[in-house]
Regions:
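Preference for solvent-exposed, low-hydrophobicity sequence contexts
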Residues: 26-307
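A recurrent domain-boundary module in secreted/ectodomain proteins
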Residues: 22-23, 291-316, 585-610
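Substrate-binding cleft of extracellular glycoside hydrolase catalytic domains
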Residues: 371-437
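Bacterial Sec-dependent N-terminal signal peptides
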Residues: 8, 14-29
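Catalytic grooves of carbohydrate-active enzymes
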Residues: 254-272, 338-365, 375, 431-434, ...
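Positively charged n-region of N-terminal signal peptides that target proteins for export
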Residues: 1-4, 20
Length: 610
């Protein structure tokens, strides 16, 4: 049985992953090699700040309160509603800001109940003072000393919430809806600013000189999420749609363009927008030379990111190419799960039996795109957990490149050549320090000259990168499996493999290269019948559900009443593949391709490690 090893300081973890032979390398057996070689698993960089840390860094206090009834965006008048969440988020932000400015030592944690948040709370090196409501917190001395008053907003004027968020850090005041104003006044707080008739545009005009330009929060109206982070770091905060989940009332695209041009290049834009073609706003961010970070339904970002630069632990498990069977005469297929750029997904039903801990992960050798760069700064403890729970047969991919952007138009409205190189270095440093060997990139057109310019930039900045996978925005499999080659800084040929097929529930039909597990299996078999050396990279759409139709080869039936996701539908596809198609993880797919295309170069490279 083949074993892959993961080296954590002073720890080697071995696990069975395939039916090929593998023996754990013994360094003493290689001490007399004619060519000096090193252990492949040791090919990574030590953790260090090499300019890759682009998220504003929060200081950590000495104690914290847990605020209850603080995660609801329900627009009603209860004590567990958006109105109380606004107060809670502003308390979270103002106490964190006070810690950052050495005016306080007390912080506040929102009582999010998922297992991921519970685990991250357990890692907080602060004293837990207990639970309290927002009203109880507002009467505590260590909280009051961080608050100078309140900023008034009006839920009936949705954009006032965004304006109030910016005003909150300018005036060091909590956000209060008109409904709760009297109650807050009764506690002794006075109004410092009236944002009840303000908009995102007026907030930008009035407060831009009071905001830091090293990040931006972009969130829908009528939500409280991420307001605390914006306040803690004195950031601009904007909604794209002027009304929640509606384009009918207009948008703030022109204001967004101004803000994005004002931002320091390569800044994270944290959040998302609802009920709009994502390409509309993501492309604005991408063209500006900044990174959209899908992170809307998050809580506690000030605390989960605190002191992140000193909290880097954990490496990806990698496939050692010295122990790959390169004598196979089969075609190869490799599955990877999409949407790994989505940071909020990582704390909302990702590390479970449906996805990351699916029992079918081992047999399918499915690869996982993860937001490695962003988790390293936003939730380093969660990233440590994800890497520790990685199944050794499943490759890890840095998915998106420190966010969701389109590589072929990244920084097209800015200094593209310079920013591409800097962004590639940022991504490369994160990857090398986490021992992640594959980069996944999104493009509008994966075959365009601009895309190839970007591929070269990322490959040139990372000499530990073994390959790139490229996904087209629409359709994901628009690259048709085309492969491009580029030389890295050492003159080694590195492939860029475009997605050939996609397992995607399209309803009552399949497209030319996207569809049900049965359909994709038929396409892989058809291709393998024409050429014994084929390399099929298959995207498994994260949000597509399928039904189990057993041994039937019906090409549409799996789309009906689906309840299975991720590796499980991929396993049905795999079971239908002919014997001349071998399923491998994405690292092995890349190495097999490199050996086939550049055999002498690859053989020579393999002698340099064991």
């Amino acid at each position: 049985m083949k074993k892959y090893i993961m080296i954590i300081p002073f720890l080697i973890v071995a696990a069975l992953t395939s039916c090929d032979s593998y023996v754990t390398p013994d360094p003493t057996a290689h001490k007399n090699d004619s060519i000096k070689s090193v252990l492949y698993m040791n090919q990574y960089d030590q953790f260090a700040n090499k300019g890759q840390y682009n998220l504003p860094e929060q200081k950590l206090g000495t104690k914290y309160w847990v605020v209850v009834n603080s995660t609801s965006n329900t627009n009603d008048y209860s004590d567990n509603s958006l109105r109380t969440s606004l107060i809670a988020e502003s308390i979270i932000g103002l106490t964190a800001l006070a810690v950052n400015e050495d005016r306080g030592t007390t912080m506040v944690w929102s009582d999010a109940t998922s297992s991921e948040y519970i685990a991250m709370q357990g890692n907080l090196s602060m004293t837990n003072e207990g639970k309290a409501s927002v009203w109880e917190l507002l009467e505590k001395t260590d909280i009051r000393q961080c608050i100078k008053g309140y900023v008034l907003c009006n839920m009936l004027k949705q954009e006032s919430l965004a304006a109030a968020t910016v005003a909150a850090h300018v005036y060091q005041s909590i956000i209060v809806d008109t409904y709760n104003e009297a109650k807050v006044k009764a506690l002794g707080y006075t109004k410092t600013y009236d944002a009840s008739s303000k908009t995102s545009a007026t907030a930008w005009t009035e407060f831009k000189d009071s905001c830091n330009n090293n990040a931006l929060v972009l969130m829908p109206t009528l939500t409280a999420n991420n307001k605390g982070f914006a306040i803690a770091h004195k950031l601009m905060f904007i909604n794209y749609n002027k009304k929640y989940a509606s384009t009918a009332s207009g948008d703030n695209s022109s204001v967004c363009k101004e803000i994005l041009a004002w931002l320091k290049p390569l800044s994270p834009v944290i959040g998302w927008e609802q009920n709009i073609d994502e390409h509309t706003f993501v492309d604005l961010v991408s063209q500006s030379g900044n990174m959209m970070v899908p992170a809307d339904w998050l809580y506690n970002l000030p605390l989960t990111s605190a002191n992140y630069s000193g909290n880097q632990i954990g490496l990806a498990t990698v496939t050692n190419p010295r122990y790959i069977n390169f004598s196979d005469t089969t075609s190869y297929a490799s599955f990877f799960l999409t949407d790994g750029d989505n940071v909020q997904w990582m704390v909302n039903s990702f590390e479970n039996s449906k996805y990351y801990l699916n029992n079918d992960n081992l047999t399918t050798k499915i690869s996982f795109g993860l937001p490695i760069c962003n988790l390293a700064t936003m939730m380093p403890n969660l990233l440590t957990s994800l890497l520790a729970n990685q199944a050794p047969s499943n490759s890890i991919i840095e998915y998106g490149g420190a966010g969701y952007m389109y590589a072929d138009d990244f920084a097209s409205n800015a200094d593209r050549t310079n920013l591409l190189a800097k962004h590639a270095a940022l991504v490369g440093n994160h990857m090398k320090q986490r021992r992640v060997k594959i980069l996944g990139l999104f493009c509008n057109d994966v075959s365009s000259a601009a895309a190839q310019e970007a591929y070269q930039a990322y490959i040139s900045q990372n000499d530990q990168l073994i390959g790139v996978i490229a996904v087209q925005y629409d359709p994901y499999a628009g690259g048709n499996g085309n492969i491009f080659w580029f030389k890295n800084s050492n003159g080694i040929n590195i492939p860029v493999i475009t997605t050939r097929y996609s397992i995607w529930n399209l309803g009552n039909s399949n497209s030319s290269n996207q569809g049900t597990p049965a359909f994709v299996a038929s396409k892989i078999n058809e291709l393998a019948a024409t050429d014994k050396s084929t390399y099929s990279l298959v995207a498994v759409h994260a949000w597509s559900a399928f039904s189990d139709i057993g041994s039937s080869n019906d090409l549409i039936a799996e789309n009906t009443n689906g309840s299975y996701y991720s590796a499980t539908p991929a396993s049905w596809c795999m079971k239908r593949l002919n014997s001349n198609v071998k399923v491998v993880n994405t690292e092995e797919l890349i190495w097999q391709l490199r050996m086939k295309t550049y055999p002498e170069e690859t053989k020579s490279l393999l002698t340099t490690f064991y």
